[in-house]
Swiss-Prot record:
UniProt record, GO biological process: protein transport; root morphogenesis; vesicle-mediated transport
CHCR repeats: 663-844
GO cellular component, one term: CORVET complex
Biological function: Essential protein required during embryogenesis. Believed to act as a component of the putative class C core vacuole/endosome tethering (CORVET) endosomal tethering complexes. CORVET is required for vacuolar transport of SYP22. Involved in root development. Plays a role in vesicle-mediated protein trafficking of the endocytic membrane transport pathway.
Assembly notes: Component of the class C core vacuole/endosome tethering (CORVET) complex. Their common core is composed of the class C Vps core proteins VPS11, VCL1, VPS18 and VPS33, which in CORVET further associates with VPS3. Interacts directly with VPS11. Binds to RABF2A and RABF2B.
Domain annotation CNH: ranges: 21-339
Location in or out of the cell: Endosome membrane; Cytoplasm
The protein's name: Vacuolar sorting protein 3
Length: 984
């Protein structure tokens, strides 16, 4: 046996003895441990052998002589107590399976047969059912006589059955036989109860095809091989076509049905072409080393024999995986038969009078052999092939991937090892823990003790694995120099890797495995081990960003295992994130505070570095101090101890007031902070933080504490006063200095988008809970005129409000609107007096006075207006306005008179209409009926409604005085009749 993979192994040999040679061969398994072997010889004998697969012994059971001519073909029909059909000397012979009875020859039309093939139907075939026409009771006596003689019933056509169910009953088999220039499709009927009696029915006769050497019948098509080439024949229509022709110098045709794929292999010398049922080539050609005498199918392999050698090829690629010599070169033609009906593990090869039995090596042993030889690629290919053919279970497939992965890992091929681990569905991620952390450790008990094949050492830390692997490479290199063959990969000899590179590759790939394993549904201890060890691996690779992402997200890291290591290595940010996710906020805040204090002492690389920070799902870059404060604020935004928030609020506000506001105004907090304690915790100089906090309490939390509202208003007022002082100082200074003062505040952080005075004015107008007098006391002597106007209005000092609006702010529209809100005419007169006599040496505001008279002159008394007008007022300014005011006054007076008179007329009209309604007369006679009950009124009392309906007194009491028989309710739906005023 040559050096190759052991797919099959020799199990037994048998020699017929004498000069008789084997011409035909067929196998029939009858149990798991016994297989019958039928041999056809050149002398015309049929010999039965038995192979015991448990003891690998071969025994001769029986033999039958059929004819002096060679036995060409043997078919085993049925399973238990079946039949054997043999082709010898152009005739078909029917025998029992044990050859215990004499053979019966089928005569009639079946003589001179060259080749015979049994019909095979695919698993999902929709081929036509071949059903012979039943012999009816009125059939001619000649047809019945021919059938009784065994001549067969000739059927001229093939009928299809709608149910697509072929009539293959017990003892009914369909064959194609080639006789001279014609081919017959027959059904052989072998009734079990009738012993060897059998008959056949001719289903179809196809003419015009001669010289057939080999046949395969699959579904609706027969593929025939002749010396000229291969043809495709339809068993339905009888039409034939050429698949391809053979070269002039070529060996005889050879066909092999591939039962696994339901395809057919066509041989052209040493080239095999696979075609489907329609004769269409599928895939590429298979090139063998020599032209085979016979071809067999063993699982997903093709087996060829010839010239004393047996070769096993992969079906897909045609690559030879094993070559076995079973006889001398030039020993003559060989035959091959495989157990295609049983478990598919038995293979028999014949040469002359000898039989050699082979059994397929179990795939576990094949894989073990390949793994021992470190032929990993072939192993993986074999495993994938077994999986695609469905010959291994999912559990076994998972086991094999894990086993291959372990061997690759100990061979320092870490990437390929992890790829195999990932393909293993049953492998536990905890199995790789011993490669990362030495035993004993926290997770030693969760590592499963899976039983592998013992082809690799027990798991050990990667340092030991790499060291042992490098030593093995050195030993292999020494042995190779000594002339010995070693299984070490050539890559390690040509380009030996360094220890550091191997460790880096090991850590990177096992990190990849753990990252993917996190997505699996695992127990809590295993999840803790994965995340904790993953953090250690990130630390070893110095992947700081991955460390921080893992620590800041949902994880199962064990803090006790990482706390000391992260502190020693200086990964304090990662440790702070880890503390925060584990609910240890106090420790995390201590680290963030330490960062802000020691920012320039080496905890950060460079004070100018910007740190990425995720804020509202948007990645921004902050300075190191700001990033630390932001992370601290993020912790304090969550539900936590209020004392903890107050403790760290001050330094967060020192770094960035925005983060302090996030802490104070967090909606996630379950326990509110005390406003008094918050004010004490914040530096009084950080006025905007306090104001923003007050604003949040009042607007978002709806606080109604008057003291809080007053404090907020006072704080805003103080800020407004400071702002006014700053603005006055800028205006008094020179322009360049003013610009410089303005630029110096550009970099400051503002918590508000609205000016402080606008916020103060809005709050003073919206809130009713503050103390206006206390605020007035603060702003009394300031220039905050509008604010003071709002406050004076709160306490009801209308005159002061008008003075501020009209004289200080000169806001005529606001002053007039305030007078409208007061709603008294004297307010407009008071405003007019202020415009005409402003006092304090101010000039009269004639335009404002004219505007007031123009807009609200109708509300003023003309005499009082004329009395108030100053003699100094230009007549041209006021003449038109006064004239329009007087006209409007007269118009309003006359309009009032008109309205008064119209009202009186309507009143008179309604009285007259009511009088007319009450004075109406209704004539009742003997024929008058009640509109409700239709009773004669006669001399009864009755009532009449405004819609002229009449009812008796009884119905009136029932309906009421406001609702008539028509359903109209006169209280809701008043009936209006035109009066004298409308008629006029």
């Amino acid at each position: 046996m040559s050096k190759s993979r052991a797919v099959v192994e020799l199990t037994a040999r048998f020699d017929l003895g004498g000069d008789d040679k084997i011409r035909a061969l067929s196998l029939s398994p009858i149990s798991d441990s016994q297989t019958l072997v039928y041999l056809g010889t050149y002398s015309g004998s049929l010999i039965l052998l038995s192979l015991d697969t448990l003891t690998n012994t071969v025994s001769r059971l029986a033999s039958v002589s059929l004819s002096p001519s060679p036995v060409e073909s043997i078919f085993v029909l049925g399973e238990e107590r079946g039949r054997v059909l043999a082709l010898c000397n152009g005739y078909l012979f029917l025998l029992d399976s044990l050859l215990s009875q004499p053979a019966k020859r089928l005569g009639g039309l079946l003589k001179g047969i060259n080749v015979i093939a049994k019909r095979v139907r695919g698993r999902d075939s929709s081929s036509t059912d071949l059903l012979p026409s039943e012999i009816s009771t009125d059939s001619s006596s000649s047809k019945k006589f021919l059938q009784l003689l065994g001549a067969g019933n000739l059927v001229s056509d093939v009928r299809g059955n709608d149910s697509r169910h072929e009539r293959v009953q017990q003892g009914h088999y369909v064959f194609a036989v080639a006789i001279g220039e014609r081919m017959l499709l027959i059904e052989l009927q072998c009734a079990e109860k009738e012993g060897l009696s059998g008959s056949f029915v001719v289903l179809k006769e196809i003419l015009g095809i001669g010289g057939i050497k080999t046949l395969v019948w699959l579904d609706d098509y027969v593929i025939a091989g002749t010396v000229k080439g291969y043809s495709l024949i339809s068993c339905v229509t009888g039409l034939s076509g050429v698949i391809f022709t053979l070269p002039d110098v070529s060996g005889p045709p050879l066909l092999k049905l591939l039962c696994k794929e339901w395809k057919v292999l066509l041989l052209v010398d040493n080239v095999g072409v696979v075609v489907d049922t329609n004769g269409q080539p599928i895939g590429g050609s298979l090139v063998f080393r020599r032209r085979p005498d016979s071809v067999g199918e063993l699982s997903f392999y093709l087996v060829t024999v010839g010239d004393g050698k047996m070769e096993i090829h992969q079906k897909k690629s045609g690559a030879c995986v094993q070559s076995v010599s079973f006889g001398p070169q030039g020993c003559g033609p060989s035959l091959l038969a495989a157990d295609e009906a049983g478990d598919g593990n038995l293979l028999v090869v014949t040469t002359l009078s000898k039989l050699i039995f082979y059994r397929r090596v179990p795939y576990e042993e094949q894989i073990k052999d390949l793994l021992r030889k470190k032929r990993y690629r072939e192993t993986i290919s074999l495993v994938e092939e077994l999986d695609s053919q469905g010959e291994i279970s999912k559990d076994m497939l998972s086991f094999l991937h894990a086993q291959i992965g372990y061997l690759l890992l100990f061979d320092l091929r870490f990437e390929e090892a992890v790829n195999q681990f990932l393909k293993s569905e049953k492998m536990e991620p905890s199995e790789v823990f011993p490669f990362i952390m030495r035993d004993p450790n926290r997770w030693s008990l969760v590592v499963p003790r899976n039983r592998y094949w013992g082809l690799h050492p027990p798991p050990a830390p990667f340092e030991d694995v790499v060291d042992n692997g490098l030593m093995a490479i050195q030993r292999a290199n020494f042995l190779r120099k000594a002339g010995m063959d070693t299984p070490v990969d050539e890559e390690f000899f040509s380009d030996p890797p360094s220890r550091a590179d191997l460790l880096d590759s090991a850590i990177k790939n096992i990190t990849r495995y753990l990252e993917i394993s996190r997505e699996k549904g695992l127990t809590l201890p295993v999840r803790e081990g994965i995340d904790t060890l993953l953090m250690l691996l990130y630390r070893a690779l110095n992947r700081v960003e991955d460390m921080e992402n893992l620590a800041s997200s949902g994880n199962n890291c064990v803090v006790e295992e990482l706390e000391t290591l992260l502190t020693e290595s200086g990964h304090l940010r990662t440790l702070a994130f880890l503390y925060a996710t584990k609910g240890m906020g106090a420790k995390a805040l201590a680290i963030w505070r330490l960062f802000t204090k020691n920012y320039s002492s080496g905890l950060w690389q460079d004070s100018d570095d910007l740190v990425p920070y995720l804020h509202d799902n948007e990645l921004i870059r902050l300075s190191g101090k700001e990033a630390a404060a932001a992370e601290a604020a993020r912790i304090l935004e969550e539900p936590c101890d209020p004392e903890l928030a107050l403790q760290h609020l001050s330094w967060i506000a020192d770094v960035n007031p925005l983060f302090a506001i996030q802490v104070l105004t967090s909606d996630k907090r379950t326990e509110e902070l005390s406003p008094e304690q918050v004010i004490q915790a914040i530096d009084p100089k950080k006025v905007e933080i306090i104001q923003r906090y007050f604003q949040w309490l009042i607007e978002e939390r709806d606080y109604t504490d008057p003291q809080l509202h007053t404090s907020y208003a006072l704080s805003l007022a103080r800020s407004a006063l400071e702002c006014v002082e700053v603005q006055n100082g800028i205006q008094e200074a020179d322009v360049p200095n003013g610009s410089e003062a303005h630029d110096s505040n550009v970099g400051s952080i503002s918590l508000f988008e609205v000016d402080v005075r606008e916020r103060l004015q809005a709050f003073l107008q919206s809130s009713d809970l503050y103390d206006p007098e206390e605020i007035l006391e603060l702003v009394e002597g300031s220039e905050l005129w509008l604010e003071k106007a709002i406050l004076y209005r709160r306490i009801g000092k209308e005159t002061l409000v008008l003075q501020i609006l009209a004289l200080k702010l000169e806001d005529c529209a606001a002053a007039e609107q305030y007078c409208v809100e007061i709603g008294r005419p004297d307010a407009f007169m008071q405003l007019l007096d202020m415009y005409l006599d402003p006092q304090n040496g101010k000039e009269p505001m004639f335009k404002a006075a004219v505007r007031l008279l123009h807009n609200h002159g109708e509300s003023l008394d003309p005499l009082q207006v004329l009395d108030k007008l100053s003699p100094d007022m230009p007549l041209k300014l006021a003449s038109d306005t006064i004239l329009r005011m007087l006209r409007a006054r007269v118009h309003h007076h006359r309009q009032g008179q008109i309205v008064h008179n119209i009202s009186r007329a309507l009143d008179v009209d309604s009285r007259l209409a009511r009088l007319e309604e009450r004075s109406r007369h209704m004539q009742i006679n003997d024929e008058s009926l009640c509109d409700s009950c239709y009773a004669r009124l006669g001399t009864k009392l009755f009532a009449m409604y405004p819609d002229d309906t009449i009812v008796c007194y009884k119905c009136y009491r029932r309906l009421g005085e406001s609702k008539s028989v028509t359903g109209r309710d006169f209280k809701r739906d008043v009936l209006i009749k035109p009066g004298w005023l409308v008629n006029r």
